[in-house]
């Protein structure tokens, strides 16, 4: 049975690795859609579908991204399982909300999920990076990025805590989309992820 996992993005690049490892033990056909950065680790390539971010404005899809999306749809249509990190970037500290939270989900990923027409499994990472990491992000995201390798290594001997939510059926999604916009659909799915 094809399905999509959706998840928050608290740690950075290792989120995709953790999901690929966890679900890869359950389903050998599980792949995760990631930015091209992880593609450089050749041992991971069979578990990845790579897309290229299009920059800060995210104005136009690149050929690599279009091919990645096509590969992902083909993978699902052939019965595969796919992992998505819809925020597309690591969680950060929101001064407005006073907490660490995912960024807004990417409209292209929301549209992809609606088009895929497969069950969706919400997954939530319960932990996050250090307070120091988020404090650096208040200075500048590039300063915070320099800290990311240390954040990966300080979790080396810590268990990763995941919660899996209820599977959201295709019928539930269709019913919701019949009376709501894609943006509302994205918020609805995001709520599932945060409640898990």
Language-model segment annotations:
Residues 65-196:
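Non-catalytic C-terminal accessory region of glycerolipid acyltransferases
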Residues 3-61:
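Catalytic core of membrane glycerolipid acyltransferases/transacylases, capturing the structured
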Residues 1-3, 80:
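Surface-exposed loop/turn positions
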């Amino acid at each position: 049975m094809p399905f999509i996992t959706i998840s928050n993005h608290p740690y950075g690049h290792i989120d995709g690795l953790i999901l690929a490892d966890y679900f890869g033990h359950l389903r050998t056909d599980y792949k995760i859609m990631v930015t091209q950065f992880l593609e450089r680790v050749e041992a991971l390539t069979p578990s990845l579908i790579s897309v290229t971010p299009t920059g800060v404005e995210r104005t136009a899809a690149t050929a690599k991204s279009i091919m990645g999306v096509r590969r992902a749809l083909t993978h699902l249509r052939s019965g595969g399982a796919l992992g998505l990190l819809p925020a597309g970037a690591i969680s950060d500290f929101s001064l407005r909300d006073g907490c660490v939270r995912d960024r807004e989900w990417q409209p292209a990923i929301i549209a992809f999920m609606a088009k895929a027409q497969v069950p969706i499994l919400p997954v939530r990472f319960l932990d996050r990076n250090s307070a120091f990491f988020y404090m650096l992000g208040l200075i500048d995201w590039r300063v915070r990025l320099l800290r990311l390798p240390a954040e990966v290594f300080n979790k080396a001997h810590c268990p990763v805590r995941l919660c899996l939510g209820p599977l959201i059926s295709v019928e539930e999604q269709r019913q919701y989309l019949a009376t709501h916009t894609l943006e509302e659909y994205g918020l609805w799915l995001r709520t599932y992820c945060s409640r898990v």
